[in-house]
Amino acid sequence: MTQEEVPLPAGAVLRPVGAEQWGVVAWLWQAFRHDLSPVVGGLPYADGRYGAAPLQPFPSPDGTGYLAWRPHPNTGEDAPVGFVLVGGLASDRRTVAAFWIAPPLRRSGLGTALALAVLERHPGPWEIGFQHDNPSAGAFWRRVADAAFGSGGWVETEEPVPGRPHVPPDHFIRSLA
């Protein structure tokens, strides 16, 4: 294991996304958007893929990514089982721009450990957004915020979605330190 790697539950390891691995993130982005589609009403475009424009700012001085890897059960080779995109690195407040864990590994502790490891890698104030109609994400991020920032070390706000007055407001968790 290298200095860049962090061991995670479920036999996984956290690694920064390498230059040659952004294509892997783009494939996982499709799974992320598929999972989110019932919440945001998202549909694939004519080519069968979900929009990936939010990936354009990555990588950059302001944004980076991390992959969770573990041996594939059928082949034993390392396979990606989750990712996190972090924005705001050149700003005063870091953001979780996207977060996804493969469904079979959800509720294994992997997601919480991955989130906490990434938050720890980038000290400073954080902002984590999630959709009002995604109560599982809300419960998850509130637990992570308590673990990362301490009870009372964060606030949650609701804010209108820009340009979409017909949808419920988004929620944002912001650390106080």
Residue ranges and their predicted role:
Residues 12-27:
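A short beta-loop-alpha structural element at the N-terminal edge
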Residues 33, 38-74:
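Active-site rim helix/loop that mediates acceptor-substrate recognition in acyltransferases
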Residues 67, 77-88, 95, 100:
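Conserved beta-strand in the GNAT
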Residues 97, 102, 106, 131:
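Residue-level recognition of the GNAT/N-acetyltransferase active site
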Residues 101, 107-120:
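Conserved acetyl-CoA-binding loop-helix of GNAT-fold acetyltransferases
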Residues 121-136:
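Conserved GNAT acetyl-CoA-binding A-motif
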Residues 132-134, 147-177:
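C-terminal "cap" of GNAT-fold acetyltransferases
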